[in-house]
A protein has these predicted regions:
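Catalytic domains of carbohydrate-active enzymes, especially glycoside hydrolases
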Residues: 5-32, 147-152
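Extracytoplasmic/secreted proteins, especially bacterial periplasmic and envelope-associated proteins
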Residues: 5-9, 51-55, 132-143
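Active-site-adjacent "subsite" loops/lids of carbohydrate-active enzymes
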Residues: 74-147
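Active-site-proximal loop/short-helix segments
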Residues: 77, 83-85, 130, 147-182
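Active-site beta-loop-alpha junctions enriched in small/polar residues
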Residues: 1, 27-29, 72-76, 157-160
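Mature catalytic domains of secreted/periplasmic carbohydrate-active enzymes
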Residues: 17, 23, 32-39, 111, ...
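Aromatic-lined substrate-binding rim segments of carbohydrate-active enzymes
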Residues: 11, 28-72
Length: 182
C-alpha cells in the first residue's frame, strides 16, 4: 500500500486467485496509508500526494473485489526508533500513552525494549482508559467510513498491551475519581 505498482500487483493477485474480498492495513503504527486529517501519513509512502486507499478502492471494485480496511487500534508504535512524522501522537500526545508503571513514562527506554525479542514487548500502546484516546480513535474510524467507499472496518490490537498495563496517570486519576472508596 505504498505505491501504485504494489497496489496493482495486489489486486492482480487477488483476481487471479479468485478472491472476492481484500483486507488492507490502513493504520499500522499510529500512521496512515490514506489521506487523513487526524493521522500522519506513513513514512513508507514516498509520494506525499499519493492516497493509497483512494487509488485502491475504485480499481478493486472495478474487478469485483470488496475492500475492508484493517487498523491497529491501540498499538501506537513498535519500532525501536522514534517516528519521523512530527505530528505523530508519540510526539504530540505523550499523555495518551499507556504504561505498566506509575513512574513518569520514558519513551526512549520503552522503545529500547522492542530490540529484545524475548521480553514480549510489542511496542507503545495508547491508553484505552484515557477518554481522549477513544474520542480520537472514533474520529479516525468515522473519517474512513465517511470518506472512503469501504465494505468493512476491522479493528486489531483493541486491548491493553498485557495485564500489567493500564497505569496511564489520567486513567488512574479518572478511576479514583469515580471509585473513591476503592
Amino acid at each position: 500500500m505504498v505505491a501504485e505498482e504494489s497496489i496493482d500487483r495486489m489486486i492482480e493477485y487477488a483476481v487471479i486467485n479468485r478472491f472476492n474480498n481484500i483486507v488492507v492495513q490502513v493504520r499500522g503504527r499510529g500512521d496512515a496509508f490514506y489521506n487523513s486529517a487526524f493521522v500522519p501519513k506513513s513514512s513508507l509512502i514516498k509520494n506525499v500526494d499519493f492516497d493509497p486507499l483512494a487509488y485502491l478502492i475504485p480499481k478493486a471494485k472495478q474487478k469485483g473485489l470488496k475492500v475492508h480496511v484493517w487498523l491497529n487500534t491501540y498499538l501506537l508504535w513498535s519500532s525501536s526508533v522514534m517516528p519521523i512524522q512530527k505530528d505523530h501522537l508519540i510526539h504530540t500526545r505523550k499523555d495518551w500513552i499507556d504504561s505498566n508503571t506509575t513512574s513518569p513514562l520514558n519513551i526512549m527506554g520503552e522503545l529500547k525494549k522492542s530490540r529484545i525479542k524475548s521480553n514480549g514487548f510489542e511496542g507503545l500502546y495508547l491508553s484505552p482508559g484515557h477518554p481522549n484516546v477513544n474520542k480520537h480513535l472514533l474520529k479516525v474510524f468515522k473519517e474512513l467510513v465517511e470518506n472512503y467507499d469501504i465494505d468493512g472496518l476491522h479493528l486489531d490490537y483493541i486491548r491493553f498491551h498485557d495485564s500489567g498495563y493500564g497505569k496511564n496517570p489520567y486513567s488512574i486519576a479518572n478511576y479514583r475519581k469515580f471509585n473513591a472508596s476503592t
